[in-house]
């Protein structure tokens, strides 16, 4: 009996098998894996949510540093 799960590559849609020895899973190839990475890096892929003001992060970190020093 074959228990290996068939999946589609998220980039090209090619059918492949989910196997522990596939170093590119869930992608079918290194090419598709790198395309996906590039899409995240260029922000053409994003996780939906509200934008965060970078200044508020700095302010929050500074407040935490002051608490840690006390």
Curated annotation (Swiss-Prot):
Source superkingdom: Bacteria
Cofactor note: Binds 1 zinc ion.
Region span, Disordered: 43-70
Keyword Zinc: yes
GO molecular function, one term: zinc ion binding
InterPro entries xref list: DNA_gyrase_inhibitor_YacG (IPR005584), Znf_NHR/GATA (IPR013088)
Residues binding Zn(2+), per UniProt: 9, 12, 28, 32
Essential cofactor(s): Zn(2+)
Any one Gene Ontology BP term: regulation of DNA-templated transcription
Pfam families found in the cross-reference section: YacG
Key words, A-Z: Metal-binding, Zinc
Protein task: Inhibits all the catalytic activities of DNA gyrase by preventing its interaction with DNA. Acts by binding directly to the C-terminal domain of GyrB, which probably disrupts DNA binding by the gyrase.
HAMAP family reported in the protein's UniProt record: DNA_gyrase_inhibitor_YacG
Similarity annotation: Belongs to the DNA gyrase inhibitor YacG family.
Known partners and oligomeric status: Interacts with GyrB.
Protein name: DNA gyrase inhibitor YacG
Organism: Legionella pneumophila (strain Lens)
Taxonomic lineage of the native organism: Bacteria, Pseudomonadati, Pseudomonadota, Gammaproteobacteria, Legionellales
């Amino acid at each position: 009996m074959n228990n290996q799960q068939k999946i589609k590559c998220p980039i090209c849609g090619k059918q492949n098998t989910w196997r522990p020895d596939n170093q590119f899973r869930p992608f079918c190839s290194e090419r598709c894996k790198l395309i996906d990475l590039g899409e995240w890096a260029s922000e053409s892929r994003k996780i939906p949510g509200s934008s965060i003001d970078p200044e508020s992060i700095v302010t929050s970190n500074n407040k935490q540093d002051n608490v840690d020093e006390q």
